[in-house]
């Protein structure tokens, strides 16, 4: 409804974001802790979901080939497909081929639990079909070295910044790509430096490089602040030992 739209709050948020980005500085190249804002965090998870597509695996263009049932990532990485959550963006009873969906783990404590196998590829590979892709991927909350009680947790971006103490907060990606065969990536970023959990100044014109397996094995935090309107329920996330170059 038009009456439910708070245009003034939206414009105020956009203005604040623009003002905070005035006067960016370059940081020295090096290894930093990296926090990724929930508005762009799915950029780093999308290549993982793509690599779990059986079409890529059958064509041998996936860096997660021959990974089903194996522990590839750390205990802190659990990705669920919450396809049957009523009334939520992305939820559905069937995929476009008519295969029934279900709530299920895609990655459970670092173990690959599912490939996405459509009916055509299932016949080519001689395996049972699943759903063709994730309906509503949800990254579960995590903080390295801390026990988070189910149903009693709230981990915001502010909490993650305080947990990481010092590093770079990424709020946008400026181009770049990842290699689907090797998992190597290079992305341009923009965002803010932070110290003692507080944002200090904007940064631009930096690159992050590495390998997606290594990156996700350096996961140290995942929040509970995924955007409700998004099909990809990916919260703010944090990694350690990320290579930045100016």
Question: What label would you give each PLM region?
Answer:
Residues 1-5, 37, 45, 49, ...:
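Extended amphipathic alpha-helical scaffolds
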Residues 22-30, 56-60, 168-172, 227-228:
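Residue-level signal for secondary-structure boundary elements
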Residues 1-48, 52:
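Internal alpha/beta scaffold segment
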Residues 2-10, 24-26, 37, 56, ...:
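Catalytic cores of large soluble enzymes that bind and process phosphate-bearing ligands
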Residues 10-13, 63, 159, 214:
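Exposed alpha-helical structural elements
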Residues 51, 67-246:
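Dual-mode signal for accessory low-complexity, basic/Gly-rich regions
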């Amino acid at each position: 409804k038009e009456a439910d739209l708070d245009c003034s709050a939206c414009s105020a948020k956009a203005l604040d974001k623009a003002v905070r980005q005035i006067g960016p500085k370059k940081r020295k190249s090096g290894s930093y802790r990296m926090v990724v804002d929930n508005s762009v965090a799915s950029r780093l998870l999308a290549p993982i979901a793509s690599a779990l597509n059986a079409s890529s695996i059958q064509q041998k263009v996936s860096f997660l080939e021959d990974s089903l049932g194996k522990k590839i990532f750390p205990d802190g990485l659990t990705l669920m497909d919450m396809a049957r959550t009523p009334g939520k963006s992305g939820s559905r009873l069937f995929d476009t081929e008519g295969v029934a969906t279900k709530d299920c783990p895609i990655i459970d404590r670092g173990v690959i639990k599912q490939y996405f196998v459509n009916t055509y590829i299932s016949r080519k590979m001689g395996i049972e079909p699943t759903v063709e892709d994730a309906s509503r991927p949800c990254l579960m909350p995590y903080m390295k070295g801390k026990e988070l009680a189910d149903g009693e947790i709230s981990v915001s971006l502010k909490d993650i910044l305080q947990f990481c103490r010092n590093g770079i907060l990424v709020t946008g990606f400026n181009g770049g790509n990842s290699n689907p065969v090797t998992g190597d990536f290079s992305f341009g970023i923009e965002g803010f430096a932070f110290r003692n959990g507080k944002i200090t100044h904007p940064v631009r014109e930096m690159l992050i490089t590495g390998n997606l397996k290594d990156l996700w094995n350096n996961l140290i935090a995942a929040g509970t602040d995924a955007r409700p309107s998004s099909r990809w329920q990916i919260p703010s996330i944090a990694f350690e030992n990320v290579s930045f170059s100016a």
